[in-house]
Amino acid sequence: VDHPEMVLGNLELESTQYGHDLTVAPIEGAVLADQLAEEMKALGVSDVRVEDKCYVYGKIPATKGYEGKTKLGFIAHMDTVSDYCDHDIIPVVHKNYDGGDLPLGTSGRTLTVKDFPHLPSLAGRTLITTDGTTVLGADDKAGVAEIMTMAEALIKENIPHGPISIAFTPDEEVGGGTDHFNVEKFGAQFAY
Protein backbone atom coordinates (compact mmCIF):
# COMPACT_ATOMS: atom_id res chain seq x y z
CA VAL A 1 0.00 0.00 0.00
CA ASP A 2 1.58 3.26 -1.12
CA HIS A 3 -0.98 5.51 0.55
CA PRO A 4 -2.29 3.83 3.69
CA GLU A 5 -3.87 7.11 4.84
CA MET A 6 -6.15 7.13 1.77
CA VAL A 7 -7.17 3.53 2.34
CA LEU A 8 -7.64 4.03 6.08
CA GLY A 9 -9.86 7.07 5.67
CA ASN A 10 -12.11 5.24 3.24
CA LEU A 11 -12.19 2.03 5.29
CA GLU A 12 -13.37 3.87 8.39
CA LEU A 13 -16.43 5.29 6.63
CA GLU A 14 -19.42 2.99 6.86
CA SER A 15 -20.73 2.24 3.38
CA THR A 16 -23.08 -0.70 3.64
CA GLN A 17 -26.38 -0.78 1.79
CA TYR A 18 -29.34 -0.34 4.11
CA GLY A 19 -31.11 -3.67 3.93
CA HIS A 20 -31.99 -4.63 0.40
CA ASP A 21 -33.94 -1.51 -0.53
CA LEU A 22 -32.14 -0.28 -3.63
CA THR A 23 -34.40 2.77 -3.83
CA VAL A 24 -32.64 4.30 -0.83
CA ALA A 25 -29.13 5.72 -1.12
CA PRO A 26 -27.52 5.34 2.32
CA ILE A 27 -26.29 8.55 3.95
CA GLU A 28 -22.92 6.89 4.64
CA GLY A 29 -22.60 5.97 0.97
CA ALA A 30 -23.25 9.58 0.03
CA VAL A 31 -20.51 10.71 2.42
CA LEU A 32 -18.02 8.28 0.87
CA ALA A 33 -19.08 9.23 -2.67
CA ASP A 34 -18.56 12.93 -1.91
CA GLN A 35 -15.21 12.24 -0.22
CA LEU A 36 -13.98 10.22 -3.21
CA ALA A 37 -15.09 12.96 -5.60
CA GLU A 38 -13.09 15.52 -3.61
CA GLU A 39 -10.03 13.22 -3.54
CA MET A 40 -10.31 12.69 -7.30
CA LYS A 41 -10.43 16.45 -7.91
CA ALA A 42 -7.40 16.95 -5.64
CA LEU A 43 -5.48 14.35 -7.67
CA GLY A 44 -6.28 16.19 -10.91
CA VAL A 45 -9.00 13.91 -12.29
CA SER A 46 -11.32 15.89 -14.57
CA ASP A 47 -15.09 15.87 -15.14
CA VAL A 48 -15.64 14.53 -11.61
CA ARG A 49 -19.27 14.20 -10.64
CA VAL A 50 -21.48 12.38 -8.16
CA GLU A 51 -24.72 11.38 -9.81
CA ASP A 52 -28.04 10.22 -8.40
CA LYS A 53 -27.85 7.10 -6.24
CA CYS A 54 -24.18 7.81 -5.31
CA TYR A 55 -22.41 6.91 -8.55
CA VAL A 56 -19.05 8.70 -8.82
CA TYR A 57 -17.51 9.35 -12.25
CA GLY A 58 -14.32 11.00 -13.47
CA LYS A 59 -11.95 11.09 -16.42
CA ILE A 60 -8.25 11.36 -17.03
CA PRO A 61 -7.75 12.83 -20.51
CA ALA A 62 -5.27 11.11 -22.80
CA THR A 63 -1.74 12.41 -22.87
CA LYS A 64 -0.77 14.29 -26.03
CA GLY A 65 -0.36 11.90 -28.92
CA TYR A 66 -2.44 9.16 -27.26
CA GLU A 67 -5.91 10.65 -27.84
CA GLY A 68 -6.83 7.96 -30.40
CA LYS A 69 -5.93 5.04 -28.17
CA THR A 70 -8.52 2.68 -26.70
CA LYS A 71 -10.70 4.32 -24.03
CA LEU A 72 -10.17 2.25 -20.88
CA GLY A 73 -12.33 2.28 -17.80
CA PHE A 74 -11.71 1.26 -14.20
CA ILE A 75 -14.63 0.52 -11.87
CA ALA A 76 -14.86 -0.46 -8.20
CA HIS A 77 -17.79 -0.55 -5.81
CA MET A 78 -17.92 1.48 -2.61
CA ASP A 79 -20.36 -0.58 -0.58
CA THR A 80 -19.23 -3.36 1.71
CA VAL A 81 -20.82 -6.50 3.06
CA SER A 82 -23.03 -5.93 6.08
CA ASP A 83 -23.38 -9.49 7.34
CA TYR A 84 -20.87 -9.18 10.19
CA CYS A 85 -19.96 -6.20 12.38
CA ASP A 86 -19.75 -3.45 9.80
CA HIS A 87 -19.79 -0.42 12.16
CA ASP A 88 -16.88 1.31 13.86
CA ILE A 89 -14.27 -0.38 11.68
CA ILE A 90 -10.79 -0.16 13.18
CA PRO A 91 -8.15 -0.79 10.51
CA VAL A 92 -4.71 -1.81 11.77
CA VAL A 93 -1.56 -0.93 9.80
CA HIS A 94 1.27 -3.46 10.01
CA LYS A 95 4.37 -1.69 8.68
CA ASN A 96 7.31 -3.81 7.58
CA TYR A 97 5.38 -7.03 8.27
CA ASP A 98 7.76 -9.78 9.46
CA GLY A 99 6.15 -12.70 7.58
CA GLY A 100 4.93 -14.57 10.67
CA ASP A 101 1.57 -15.01 12.34
CA LEU A 102 -0.42 -11.80 12.25
CA PRO A 103 -2.47 -10.85 15.34
CA LEU A 104 -5.64 -8.88 14.59
CA GLY A 105 -5.49 -6.14 17.20
CA THR A 106 -6.40 -7.24 20.70
CA SER A 107 -9.35 -9.39 19.55
CA GLY A 108 -7.54 -12.68 20.18
CA ARG A 109 -7.88 -13.54 16.50
CA THR A 110 -4.76 -14.26 14.46
CA LEU A 111 -4.02 -14.90 10.80
CA THR A 112 -1.62 -17.84 11.04
CA VAL A 113 0.97 -18.94 8.52
CA LYS A 114 -0.47 -22.44 8.89
CA ASP A 115 -3.91 -21.29 7.70
CA PHE A 116 -2.58 -18.69 5.23
CA PRO A 117 0.68 -20.11 3.81
CA HIS A 118 1.18 -17.15 1.46
CA LEU A 119 1.74 -14.75 4.40
CA PRO A 120 5.55 -15.12 4.48
CA SER A 121 5.71 -13.90 0.86
CA LEU A 122 4.38 -10.55 2.12
CA ALA A 123 7.29 -9.97 4.52
CA GLY A 124 8.64 -6.44 4.44
CA ARG A 125 5.42 -4.95 3.09
CA THR A 126 2.82 -2.76 4.76
CA LEU A 127 -0.41 -4.67 5.38
CA ILE A 128 -3.77 -3.35 6.51
CA THR A 129 -6.08 -5.65 8.45
CA THR A 130 -9.11 -5.31 10.66
CA ASP A 131 -8.63 -5.37 14.42
CA GLY A 132 -10.53 -8.67 14.38
CA THR A 133 -13.82 -7.30 15.70
CA THR A 134 -15.33 -6.12 12.39
CA VAL A 135 -15.09 -6.71 8.68
CA LEU A 136 -12.36 -4.67 7.02
CA GLY A 137 -14.36 -3.57 4.01
CA ALA A 138 -11.52 -4.25 1.59
CA ASP A 139 -14.12 -5.67 -0.85
CA ASP A 140 -14.01 -3.39 -2.65
CA LYS A 141 -12.47 -0.40 -0.95
CA ALA A 142 -9.08 -1.92 -1.83
CA GLY A 143 -10.17 -1.64 -5.46
CA VAL A 144 -11.08 2.00 -4.89
CA ALA A 145 -7.61 2.61 -3.39
CA GLU A 146 -5.88 0.88 -6.32
CA ILE A 147 -7.77 2.99 -8.86
CA MET A 148 -7.02 6.19 -6.94
CA THR A 149 -3.33 5.23 -6.72
CA MET A 150 -3.28 4.54 -10.48
CA ALA A 151 -4.90 7.92 -11.18
CA GLU A 152 -2.33 9.69 -9.03
CA ALA A 153 0.57 7.91 -10.74
CA LEU A 154 -0.72 8.60 -14.27
CA ILE A 155 -1.23 12.28 -13.54
CA LYS A 156 1.74 13.13 -11.29
CA GLU A 157 4.33 11.00 -13.07
CA ASN A 158 3.02 12.03 -16.50
CA ILE A 159 2.84 8.41 -17.67
CA PRO A 160 1.65 8.27 -21.31
CA HIS A 161 -1.86 6.80 -21.64
CA GLY A 162 -5.04 6.90 -23.67
CA PRO A 163 -8.35 8.23 -22.34
CA ILE A 164 -9.24 6.81 -18.90
CA SER A 165 -12.68 6.70 -17.31
CA ILE A 166 -13.16 6.01 -13.59
CA ALA A 167 -16.34 5.03 -11.76
CA PHE A 168 -17.21 4.05 -8.22
CA THR A 169 -20.58 2.38 -7.79
CA PRO A 170 -22.90 1.64 -4.86
CA ASP A 171 -25.00 -1.44 -4.11
CA GLU A 172 -22.83 -4.23 -5.54
CA GLU A 173 -23.17 -6.30 -2.38
CA VAL A 174 -26.95 -6.48 -2.86
CA GLY A 175 -26.89 -7.01 -6.62
CA GLY A 176 -27.78 -3.51 -7.77
CA GLY A 177 -24.39 -2.03 -8.61
CA THR A 178 -25.05 -1.52 -12.30
CA ASP A 179 -28.77 -0.75 -12.12
CA HIS A 180 -28.25 2.99 -12.66
CA PHE A 181 -24.74 2.94 -14.17
CA ASN A 182 -24.48 5.45 -17.01
CA VAL A 183 -22.51 3.52 -19.65
CA GLU A 184 -22.77 6.29 -22.25
CA LYS A 185 -21.41 9.03 -19.97
CA PHE A 186 -18.76 6.65 -18.60
CA GLY A 187 -17.44 6.50 -22.15
CA ALA A 188 -15.01 3.58 -21.99
CA GLN A 189 -14.68 0.98 -24.73
CA PHE A 190 -13.46 -1.60 -22.21
CA ALA A 191 -13.50 -1.54 -18.42
CA TYR A 192 -11.97 -3.49 -15.58
Predicted regions located by residue number:
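Acidic/His- and Gly-rich active-site-bordering loop/insert found
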Residues: 2-126
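Acidic/histidine-rich catalytic neighborhood of metal-dependent amide-processing enzymes
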Residues: 120-192
